[in-house]
């Protein structure tokens, strides 16, 4: 493996770690309604588990409500059950094929719990970044040992890997800071 390929692979892995963090943070509830809250909700449909977005359309008519328009009338009770089982703290109100999910205001205590959870997700992402950095540095050692790169080039590339790690680590920090602001805004 050459050094350019290695850098590209490390960057792709770090991008993936950042995307995972972004997905986890979208699942955290802020005070506003967001269809992203329902991304992980699965529904028993047609004999298998399906994502809610595959059996209904989701919308936010206002800042405190999510509407779930179920396409198949026979699925309404399964969708209600899926939302309840997801344990999001939302109570479905059904009106025909339309399910309204009023978003209750977050208590101060719940906000603090969500901030802690966001920080945990951030720390998990940083651990992933450090593991990726370690793998990259091990690969560089192997390249040096096999006389593919010189010792000084190994040192320079290690510094580049560290810079890349620092860059992505600061992206994680800013994502967490932004989410914390969103959660704590009343």
UniProtKB/Swiss-Prot annotation:
Cellular component aspect of the GO annotation: cytosol
Molecular function (Gene Ontology), one example: ribosomal large subunit binding
Record's keyword terms, sorted: Cytoplasm, Protein biosynthesis
The keyword Iron-sulfur is annotated on this UniProt entry: no
Subcellular localization(s) per the UniProt record: Cytoplasm
Primary localization class, coarse: cytoplasm
One GO term of the biological process aspect: cytoplasmic translational termination
Record-linked InterPro entries: Ribosome_recyc_fac, Ribosome_recyc_fac_dom, RRF_sf
UniProt keyword annotation of Translocase present: no
Its biological purpose: Responsible for the release of ribosomes from messenger RNA at the termination of protein biosynthesis. May increase the efficiency of translation by recycling ribosomes from one round of translation to another.
Family: Belongs to the RRF family.
Name of the molecule in the record: Ribosome-recycling factor
